Amino acid sequence: MPLHVGREGKEDLGYLSDNTGDNISHKNSYYSELTGVYWVWKNFKDSENVGICHYRRFLVNDAGRLFTEAEIESLLSRYDLITTKTLTMRYPYYDGFAHNHNQKDLDVAMEVIGELYPEYMDTLNVMVHKRETWFGNIMICKKTLFDTYCSWLFPIFFEMEKRIDVDAYDDYHKRIYGFISEFLLYVWATVNGLKVYQCKVGMLGEKAETKELKLALSEFFIKKDILGAKQYILEALKKRPDVLMEASDLDGELKLAMQVITT
């Protein structure tokens, strides 16, 4: 079921929108896909199972195809949650977050969790220093479990809003709650001992930001302006460090360009 996430203040695309009913659509610039997650939690009552995907990312079976309804039913009879494969990072999660985002935001998240859910802290303090996470907030599970997760997650962020000011951040770094939630889903599932089925993620095309960056770099290369290309991509990475991630640079062209520029 297509859902226009972040619909508030945007053009009507003819889809079901997340600015109806009980919603936080106006917070999309801070919450990313979580405004859709919130909408499903509060307003969708028509199915025993629910799933969250993106406009270009989908959970797929071992054959690389979308799961059939029968496959999902079979998996959920044996597992609590279907989600992405665990991502192994170059650095511990805490260090990587501090490098790409504002460290104090993660510190505040941990502070709030310690106050609201102190029983999570032993596990959280271990996991935050491991080199593992989940990504994308992509999942399938029973609606009852989904509701339980949302009831745990959103109070954390609503309290964080009272303690941090993200209005001075650029558009990428404002999406702080969307970023942190990817890791918190992993923590929540671990603490609650969920039986998790991890699967591949199918992707349709590259991010618009990745395409734009490649096009700009090609113009520099055509002019043989390597220094200009280096300055451009380094400045772009300050605003969008995600463009070099495998989920963004699908064919590895940007990483190759970085090697050319920096050698």
List the model feature ranges, each with a label.
Residues M1-T263:
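ER/Golgi luminal nucleotide-sugar-dependent glycosyltransferases, focusing on the catalytic module
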